[in-house]
């Protein structure tokens, strides 16, 4: 968007909500939802448009946070998406896996280290983010985040925006991203599985061998 209209016209924002798509729409718990973050990319942070949005949200029941470091906050959300959405999507289990499996925790931590290394190289200070940004909205152990919901429903995922972006930035900065590279290809393979690429029946059940 910034490339088309110039970033000076943009009030940067994102939302942290754990929602689930059902037949009648998206469902989420408003009480446990962290909410909407927004803010100016540079001073003045308490701009007129920030105050205007603040006034709009007043008395709506929404949760929101105005931040002076929206860039770091956006990276904090990106880190959560990469580290928590993706490993559970590969395994096909609820988010409780990160507490119950040292192996899932190790994969998550490996992805996190790569995100933090790229952020540091870009001059993003993740220590500046709000305390609530270090975690997602409270959910049950059985919760399935958006990437796994996409796979469950046979939809293509946002993996290009997550590990795909990490691979691209890592290459530009000379930072290895092996966890993200493996994760990227695994999610892409799961998309192919949903697309029927691996349905070996009839004439498609050809002879093959290991290489």
Which positions does each model-derived feature cover?
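Active-site-proximal catalytic alpha-helix in oxidoreductases
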Residues: 71-99, 103-116, 140-142
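Short coil/loop linkers at secondary-structure junctions
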Residues: 6-8, 63, 94, 125-127, ...
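Rossmann-fold dinucleotide-binding core
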Residues: 1-73, 77
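Broad structural signal for hydrophobic residues in well-ordered alpha-helices, predominantly aliphatic
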Residues: 1-2, 87, 169
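NAD(P)-dependent Rossmann-like dehydrogenase/reductase catalytic/cofactor-binding core
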Residues: 58, 97, 105-211
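Short, hinge-like loop/turn segments at secondary-structure boundaries
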Residues: 27-31, 82-84, 196-197
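Helix-loop-beta segment of a Rossmann-like dinucleotide-binding subdomain
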Residues: 27-40, 91-100, 144-153
